[in-house]
Amino acid sequence: MRLLTTLLVSSCFVASAAAQSGSVAVKAAKIMRADGSVIEQGTLVIENGRITSIGGSDVEVPFDVLLNEYPTAVVFPGFFEAHSNSGMDRANENVPLAPFLNVKDSIDPVSFYFEDELRGGTVAIGVIPGNNTVIGGRGRVVAPAGMTIEQMTLSDDMGMKIAIGPKGGWSRSSQLAELREAVDKLNLDLREIGENLTYDGVVREDRKKAGIEEDADVADGDMWDSAAGYIRFGDDFTGKGLISEEDLDDTQRGMVDILNGDERLWVYAPSA
């Protein structure tokens, strides 16, 4: 019964914190802090999804905060699942390169996985796809509570994953070869794009000198930045400084973000 009470207290915390809103206070027989110290007859106050006070029975509870009392319970920090591809409608993609994917579009907030994790005392999960790809999509850190992905999200910049453990039917060497080929292809594509942009610039300049008016550039309203200078990694090449996000496709943008150092990158290796 004591364990059940403890888990119920944990669930109460997460449900509040996951939504990043709401307030709750808990008084319990013991509160175990992250450093291992124990507070007897402790009080914990959470406001707007964040712990604001922790201490003994003398901690002041704001008048507008719901107080829950568990005189026999032990409150302790929840667990953090650092790496998981559960809780999604599809944990992996068949394509080897998928940096254009975002786990936001795949997480199922009502999956029983999140309910089971919450009951077990887990308060944060790093959900990231891609064990069966070479480069997977973007992950995020979520709490196992909330009715929408926005309510669940604790951090949306977990980064992407490179898997060097071979997927079914592949060897490790073929997995790494696919990664090298992807980088080589990107570099070739960028050089071709740079040359085309350089040529287009020369044509526009010639037309301008000839007195031919060009149509003014009109913003297309998409999310991609049209400013030049997007490529910051690697050696210089013709037209490198002219390339913008808008000149690339989704896969190329994801690869460039990795090589530019704009994405946190994790390496998945099932064995050393």
Task: Describe every region a protein language model picked out.
Residues 5-15:
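Bacterial N-terminal signal peptides
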Residues 17-21:
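Boundary at the C-terminal end of the N-terminal hydrophobic targeting segment
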Residues 22, 31, 35-76:
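Histidine-rich, glycine-flanked metal-binding segment
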Residues 37, 56, 79, 90-93, ...:
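Short, solvent-exposed loop/turn and secondary-structure capping segments
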Residues 86, 107, 130-134:
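Acidic, glycine-rich active-site loops and adjacent beta-strand->loop/helix elements
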Residues 95, 104-111, 169-173:
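Soluble non-cytosolic domains of exported or imported proteins
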Residues 118-272:
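Polyanionic/metal-chelating signatures
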